[in-house]
Amino acid sequence: IILSKITSLSLVMAISQLIVLLFYIISALVLKVPFANYLLDFLLWSITGWIATITIVTIQIFLSIRLKNFAVPILISAILAIAGLMTLFIGQGLFSIFPYAQIAVGDRARSLVPFTLSEFILFLVVNGAYIFVFYTLAVRQLKKRFI
């Protein structure tokens, strides 16, 4: 059940990222801004932003199962998203590993240059770890509830 929710929401988020990329291309064409040199970067940033949304989806599914509520996990998400913005002022190290800042990290919102290899590996490891941990916690919580 949990994996199907994550998969379906991830598909919706992938479509959303593709729409944003399409709007970028259309706006660049309309405004006659050269974009061909940066298209691969924007495609990669869309993919890494999508990976980061899977992290948030997994955390939110865990919170929804754990709290048995709809509104409270959304409130927690809003608070943690604001906290993610606050990590910008605390330091780059915390910003790069805070779960609710991962979309900004993946979309390269802070620096419009491609990932270095070490940044890319850190991004994949951090997001993979969050997805694994919160998926495992969600499955465990669901099993505990029904067993």
What label would you give each PLM region?
Residues 3-67, 107-113, 117-120:
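Secretory targeting signals
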Residues 18, 23-24, 32, 36, ...:
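Flexible domain-boundary/linker segments
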Residues 23, 27-35, 67, 71, ...:
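Membrane-interfacial segments
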Residues 55-86:
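Functionally important transmembrane alpha-helices
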Residues 74-147:
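Terminal transmembrane helical anchor/hairpin motif
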